[in-house]
């Protein structure tokens, strides 16, 4: 009789464990996340893969859509996610203010909303994970000032500043961080033109400005978008000289794409404020999981040993929690660091 009870209890325990394991699998399979991005190529593909891979490893289903840069299409896509009843929404906003329409609709439906790379403006989301774009602008600004000081013995000269889409928070921060440094030096003239993240617009800006005046440096909001076409345009204008030669135009940018790292190695460009692109998505997955688990999160420093983005800063702002991952100041001196996403 005792042996029968032991066997029965053991079988019941195994059945319970099996049932719990199936429940866990079902719970994971029931997590559906809608992911809306402007595109899924270049840096955006790296961001998406950084999210998709760990999400799918948890058994989550990821639904992805692209807007092609059309803010209204992005809103329509997100409304479709809401109608489908997804468990969370992740977006790379086309329009930082315009995205608030979708954020409000998701909130009314009880769906947590996260943004990557670019924050919302005018509404609160659960969290935004992004590079410290202001820091990146600072780093590029300091590099330009150092070059001008070395060239002229003091910080003076002319800088062409090609922005992204200034309706987006990320471009505003990249501009603000750079301006904060450059504006300290009254003898540096800055020519600022909006490039809207479009390579052809960047080319036209370079042609228009350099056809009528000389510049000492060019700062670009995205080397992924502008660097290769800018170098090619300088060659076509017969204004290209490699680093170290007379006439070299110093080129600084943000992102750290592989194409620009190659140009830095060649001496065509000089500095990049590298983003921890693949880590954006994985960090969002981590915080969505915390939300699903009912875990509270608190402001403060986030440290991960060995990560180039560490330490990061988690802050509560008027647009919700923001996790600012540090950018890496890249030059010819540290270009081969394997941790740089452009080297991966």
Spans of model-derived segments:
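Hydrophobic alpha-helical
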Residues: 88-108, 178, 195-263
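Hinge/beta->alpha junction and helix N-cap segments in small-molecule ligand-binding domains
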Residues: 36-49, 64-73, 95, 118, ...
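Flexible loop/hinge segments that line or gate small-molecule binding clefts
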Residues: 97-135, 158, 257-263, 269-270
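Extracellular/periplasmic ligand-binding modules, especially the Venus flytrap/periplasmic-binding
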Residues: 221-229, 264-265, 271-296
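Bacterial N-terminal signal peptides
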Residues: 10-21
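Sec/Tat signal peptide C-region and signal peptidase I cleavage site
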Residues: 22-28
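Bacterial N-terminal signal peptides that target proteins for export
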Residues: 1-11
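Hinge/cleft segment of the Venus flytrap/periplasmic-binding protein
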Residues: 31, 162-166, 170, 181-182, ...
């Amino acid at each position: 009789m005792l042996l029968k009870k032991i066997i029965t209890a053991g079988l019941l325990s195994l059945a319970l464990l099996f049932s719990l394991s199936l429940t866990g699998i079902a719970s994971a399979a029931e997590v559906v996340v809608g992911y809306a991005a402007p595109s899924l190529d270049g840096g955006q593909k790296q961001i998406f893969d950084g999210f998709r891979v760990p999400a799918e490893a948890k058994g989550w289903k990821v639904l992805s859509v692209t807007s092609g840069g059309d803010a209204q299409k992005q809103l329509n896509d997100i409304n479709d996610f809401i109608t489908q009843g997804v468990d969370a929404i992740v977006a790379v906003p086309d329009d930082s203010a315009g995205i608030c329409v979708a954020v409000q609709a998701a909130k009314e439906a009880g769906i947590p909303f996260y943004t990557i790379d670019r924050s919302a403006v005018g509404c609160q989301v659960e969290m935004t994970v992004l590079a410290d774009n202001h820091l990146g602008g600072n780093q590029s600004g300091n590099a330009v000032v150092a070059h001008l000081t070395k060239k002229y013995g003091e910080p003076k000269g002319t800088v062409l500043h090609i922005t992204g889409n200034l309706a987006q928070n990320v471009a505003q921060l990249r501009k603000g961080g750079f301006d904060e440094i450059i504006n300290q030096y009254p003898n540096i003239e800055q020519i600022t033109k909006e490039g809207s993240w479009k390579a052809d617009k960047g080319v036209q800006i370079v042609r228009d400005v350099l056809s009528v005046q000389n510049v000492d440096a060019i700062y670009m909001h995205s080397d992924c978008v502008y660097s290769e076409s800018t170098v090619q345009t300088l060659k076509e204008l017969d204004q290209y000289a490699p680093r170290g030669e007379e006439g070299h135009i110093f080129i600084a940018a943000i992102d750290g794409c592989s194409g620009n790292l190659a140009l830095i190695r060649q001496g065509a460009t000089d500095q990049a404020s590298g983003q921890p692109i693949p880590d954006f998505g994985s960090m969002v997955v981590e915080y969505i999981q915390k939300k699903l688990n009912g875990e509270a999160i608190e402001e403060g420093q986030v440290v991960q040993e060995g990560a180039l983005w560490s330490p990061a800063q988690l802050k509560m702002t008027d647009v919700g929690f923001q996790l600012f991952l540090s950018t890496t100041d890249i030059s010819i001196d540290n270009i081969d660091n394997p941790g740089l996403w452009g080297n991966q």
